[in-house]
Regions:
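S-adenosylmethionine
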Residues: 1-165
């Protein structure tokens, strides 16, 4: 990937030459594929895991990117393909989230929504709102595939969602 020269110049100024060079190499390199395993069905996934994601209880980096669309475990919700950085929100949740209610305002395609649903358990509730009608179906499909039954999918603006009880 060719980074814009102005960006490279700016980060060299802000970070120094050595650190900027390291960042450019990282941005230019191939990013590892990561997944998050379902809390119940995760053992059904037959994936070549290279290492766990340190900040995610059920997250893992894969040795190589498989053809997910050909994997029945993927279609059965045994795991969710999700960038490791998106799984960091797990660290931001309180230690005891069992039974909490969470509002996810920009929920599609559903990665963080299913993460929240796994953490709050059956006693909790996640309201997954997506303002873009074109993206709601993908969200609903991913929530259905995850199958925990503690997520309500809505389509509205933040003001409408804020009035929900």
């Amino acid at each position: 990937m060719q980074l814009p020269p102005l960006f490279v110049e700016r980060i060299r100024h802000q970070l120094g030459a050595e650190e900027a060079e390291g960042l450019c190499r990282a941005l230019d390199g191939e990013q590892p594929t990561s997944v998050r395993l379902h809390p119940v069905r995760g053992e059904q996934a037959r994936l070549a895991v290279s290492r766990p994601i340190p900040w995610s209880e059920r997250g893992a980096y894969l040795e190589a990117r498989p053809s997910f669309t050909l994997d029945p475990a993927f279609h059965g919700g045994a795991y969710y393909v999700q960038e490791a950085s998106s799984q960091f929100v797990e660290r931001l949740l309180p230690a005891d989230v069992e039974g909490l209610r969470i509002l996810d305002l920009c929920a599609a395609p559903g990665g963080k929504t299913t993460l929240y649903a796994s953490k709050v358990g059956r006693a909790g509730l996640v309201v997954a709102n997506e303002i873009d009608r074109k993206r709601v179906q993908v969200l609903a499909d991913n929530v259905r595939k995850w199958g925990l039954g503690n997520v309500a999918v809505t389509c509205g603006d933040a003001e409408t969602a804020a009035r929900m009880e």
